[in-house]
């Protein structure tokens, strides 16, 4: 599985099942392959929040916000 989107979808499935730590691993792998995906950082923040990792959640939310604020260019 070398596609960031596949890892993202796996993270979604794991989070829906409450498998938080496994979801973190999937989202982190997704970010390794696609580091500018704001939605992945947002989801990772929610998972960290569920785990009680407040500092990590805040960092993920801030990263998502910064990425989302980038202007679209082509």
Identify the residue ranges that each predicted region occupies.
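Conserved structural position within tetratricopeptide repeats
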Residues: 29-32, 65-66, 73
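Helix-start (N-cap) detector for alpha-helical repeat units in TPR-like alpha-solenoids
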Residues: 4-5, 38-39, 71-72
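Register position in tetratricopeptide repeats
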Residues: 16-17, 50-51
